[in-house]
Amino acid sequence: MSNVPAELKYSKEHEWLRKEADGTYTVGITEHAQELLGDMVFVDLPEVGATVSAGDDCAVAESVKAASDIYAPVSGEIVAVNDALSDSPELVNSEPYAGGWIFKIKASDESELESLLDATAYETLLEDE
C-alpha cells in the first residue's frame, strides 16, 4: 500500500494538496501515481501567474513509461513552480510529498476543497482500483 499522509487532501486523479502557512496550497502527485508512472524524465511545469480552473490540465509528468497530465485540484492562480524539477525530475519519485512538489496555487474558491478526498477516502479509492 502506498504512503498516504493524513494531513493532505487528494484528488481522484492522484494529485495531493497541502495548505501552507501563507494560505497557498502546494500540489504534487501521490506516491501511488509516481509508482504507476515509473521513473520521471521530465516535468512540464505551469506558468507562474497563470489562472486555472479546478480540473484543468496544467502540467505534464513524463516518465519512461508514459506522459501524464497533472490537473489543478482547485481553481486559482499559480504562484510558484518547483524549478528543481527541471534538473531533477526524479524528485517526484524519491520525495513525492516533499521535494517533488510540482506547483503552488492561490485558491480562488476554497469551497472546492470540499470535493477533495481525505486520506481515508483516498486509501479506499486505491483499494478499489
From Swiss-Prot:
The keyword DNA repair does not apply. SUPFAM superfamilies: Single hybrid motif. Binds 1 lipoyl cofactor covalently. GO terms for cellular component: cytosol; glycine cleavage complex. Keywords: Lipoyl. The modification N6-lipoyllysine is found at K65. This is Glycine cleavage system H protein. It comes from Escherichia coli O139:H28 (strain E24377A / ETEC). The lineage of its organism: Bacteria, Pseudomonadati, Pseudomonadota, Gammaproteobacteria, Enterobacterales. The gene is gcvH.
